[in-house]
Amino acid sequence: MTNSSGRRRPDVTTVEIIGGPEALEIGLSDYDARWAETYLRHRRRILDALGADVDVEHIGSTSVPGLAAKPIVDIVVAVADITSEEDYLDALLAAGYELRVREPGHRLVRTPGRDVHVHVYERGAAAVHEYLLFRDHLRADADDRALYENVKRALFEQPWNDMNDYSDAKSDVILAIKSRAGAARR
């Protein structure tokens, strides 16, 4: 049974970070073509676990050839109903992923080795569009790719007590690049 939004139940209203804050203990690596291979292996694992009725894309810096990145492969999965965790979460946990974040509209599971992060959103979520817009623009625009890498390298010169703080520090440059990416698509 679904409600008027088409969901089975209301979504969570708070952010739950399982395990608490974690220090950022890794640095940037030059682009490694094996990241694409890692993505393909995990794409297959996700599809085997969830079936074909999900969208799976490689996102983040490891999805952009030539871009330095933290050696963590980011994947986005779009499901029919984010609130119906029974349709995807148990299967992802059984496939070897661990739940790290549960927040409104988003779940994050990752490998125990923390080298693959799987972001789960509802199909049609704005965040999925934003991830793909950013990825595709960086793949096509060498100047913005270089700008983004330079900002990341500068940020890695300082210590970070929490990986989320490092991500937040990139927000301004990401917003500027996404603005240019959106304008280029019009």
UniProtKB/Swiss-Prot annotation:
What top-level branch of life does the organism fall under? Answer: Bacteria
Give the UniProt family note: Belongs to the UPF0157 (GrpB) family.
Protein name as annotated: UPF0157 protein SCO7215
**Source species, please?**
Streptomyces coelicolor (strain ATCC BAA-471 / A3(2) / M145)
